[in-house]
Curated annotation (Swiss-Prot):
Pathway: Carbohydrate biosynthesis; 3-deoxy-D-manno-octulosonate biosynthesis; 3-deoxy-D-manno-octulosonate from D-ribulose 5-phosphate: step 2/3; Bacterial outer membrane biogenesis; lipopolysaccharide biosynthesis. It comes from Paraburkholderia xenovorans (strain LB400). Its EC number is 2.5.1.55. Keywords: Cytoplasm, Lipopolysaccharide biosynthesis, Transferase. GO terms for molecular function: 3-deoxy-8-phosphooctulonate synthase activity. InterPro entries: Aldolase_TIM, DAHP1/KDSA, KDO8P_synthase. GO terms for cellular component: cytoplasm. It is found in: Cytoplasm. Pfam families: DAHP_synth_1. This is 2-dehydro-3-deoxyphosphooctonate aldolase. It comes from the Bacteria. One of its GO terms (biological process) is keto-3-deoxy-D-manno-octulosonic acid biosynthetic process.
């Protein structure tokens, strides 16, 4: 699959989607994106910067949601202009899609909305690549129906069907907890869409702090290594210069100063894994 200026897939080195959870300020966004660009250039990692202009599903109605759609998109456009990076952001409603698609390179659908057929169809008709997150309530094989919805809508609109990614972000395991079943990464390959693993939301503890979500960022390296060992097309990770001060999802964000070491380890593992054949089909 072609994503911007690079090809993605299981036969390619992993690509990275990374950035802050939400756009907090222009300066922090540019600084964070610039540092990630430096790291990824050194490690030869294809990189897409991500950040949200709005967090529509916060635990509390009083939580910070962002700087607003217009300002958030303006700042993301500055990332593109100043740093030459492709950008991704999530959309939350059909009426937002046209404006967002005019700015960003990749759309993302929130996990909670993966079963909303009209919404998936509208994203698919945007003409943009779409990273479709698997809901925390969904079995991995159910993603085939979701990807098929997107492809059907694209085909009916006369657009490429080869623009959709399936993203694993953990599954609900009791109250306020998520677990990652690494089998899901292999199962989701059956969609014939590139599979992305979200290593930071997978360690989230949804609503775990009452009015906000908790998280266990110490397990991000563990799950990221496991996903790369299984074999993925891409990784998604949120990071922040100071997670303790982050306005959204700080407990599961990787400290920015730790990203280089983590990614270096993951690149080494990815190279080793993808030199060998994937044997799942031989065991049937």
């Amino acid at each position: 699959m072609k994503l911007g200026d690079f090809e993605i897939g299981l036969d390619r080195p992993f690509f990275l989607i990374a950035g802050t959870c939400v756009v907090e300020s222009e300066q922090m966004t540019i600084d964070t994106a610039g540092r990630l660009k430096e790291i990824c250039a050194k490690l030869n990692i294809p990189f897409i910067y991500k950040s949200s202009y709005d967090k529509a599903n916060r635990s509390s109605g009083k939580s910070f949601r962002g700087l607003g759609m217009d300002e958030g998109l303006r700042i993301l456009s500055e990332v593109k202009r100043q740093l030459g990076l492709p950008v991704l952001t999530d959309v939350h409603a059909e009426h937002e899609i046209e404006q967002v698609a005019s700015v960003v390179d990749v759309l993302q659908t929130p996990a909670f909305l993966c079963r909303q057929t009209d919404f998936i169809h509208a994203c698919a008709r945007s003409g943009k690549p779409v990273n479709i997150k698997k809901g925390q309530f969904l079995a991995p094989h159910d993603m085939k129906n979701v990807i098929d919805k997107a492809r059907d809508a694209a085909r009916e609109a006369g657009l490429s069907e080869d623009r959709f990614m399936a993203c694993e972000r953990g599954v609900s395991f009791g109250y306020n907890n998520l677990v990652s079943d690494m089998r899901s990464l292999a199962i989701m390959r059956e969609t014939n869409a590139p599979v992305v693993f979200d290593a930071t939301h997978s360690v989230q503890l949804p609503g775990g702090q009452g009015t906000s979500s908790g998280g266990q960022r110490e397990f991000v390296p563990v799950l990221a290594r496991a996903a790369v060992a299984v074999g993925v097309a891409g990784l998604f990770m949120e990071t922040h210069p100071n997670p303790a001060q982050a306005k959204s999802d700080g407990p599961n964000a990787v400290p920015l100063h730790r990203m280089a070491d983590l990614l270096e380890t993951l690149v080494t593992l990815d190279r080793a894994v993808k030199r060998a054949p994937f044997l799942e089909s031989d065991f049937n």
